[in-house]
């Protein structure tokens, strides 16, 4: 979704936050496309699991693990993904399924395989969190723009914005 004046920014999946602020609240409510904040059904759960996964990645990086530890981390990784999926809408579940590959069940994963899998999951979660922050910011900007528009339309004739001279008014002035 590139425009001629897009400054080489491409928005992948979702609404461009630069245009979100110019849309009215009614228009965004009528949209068939759910917002990113609606796609995370249990945000607290997703945040807790994301924090845990990030900490596990730090542990995997810090020291070499024996076979039993690697097997346990493989199970934790699979359980974490299942738990994450419970907190996500179907669209995000499908995306997560496409991006995560299961470990080989017959052998313990190597330290490198664990690091890659954990880093991939942490990166996906951080992207999700940044997307949510962007969506919330865009919603705030849209609400602010709508409030300013309401304030401006509520001013009596002849009154301008604060700091501006009054416009063309009706009636006589003393």
From Swiss-Prot:
The family note in this entry says:
Belongs to the Bpa family.
Region called Disordered, residue ranges: 1-37, 153-174
Q: Which GO terms describe its cellular component?
A: proteasome complex
Name of this protein: Bacterial proteasome activator
Answer whether the UniProt record assigns the keyword Secreted to this protein. Answer: no
Q: State the function annotated in the UniProt record.
A: Interacts with the core proteasome alpha-subunit (PrcA) through its C-terminal hydrophobic-tyrosine-X motif (HbYX motif). Interaction of Bpa with the proteasome stimulates proteasomal peptidase and casein degradation activity, which suggests Bpa could play a role in the removal of non-native or damaged proteins by influencing the conformation of the proteasome complex upon interaction.
Keyword tags: Proteasome
Q: Where is the composition biased (Gly residues)?
A: 160-174
Motif, HbYX motif: chain positions = 172-174
Source taxon at top rank: Bacteria
UniProt lists the gene as bpa
Q: Where is the signal peptide?
A: none
**Summary of subunit composition and partner proteins:** Forms a homooligomeric, either hexameric or heptameric, ring-like structure which stacks co-axially with the proteasomal alpha-rings.
| Keyword set includes tRNA-binding | no
InterPro entries the record matches: Proteasome_act (IPR019695)
Question: Which portions of this protein are annotated as coiled-coil regions?
Answer: none
Q: Name one GO biological process term.
A: regulation of proteasomal protein catabolic process
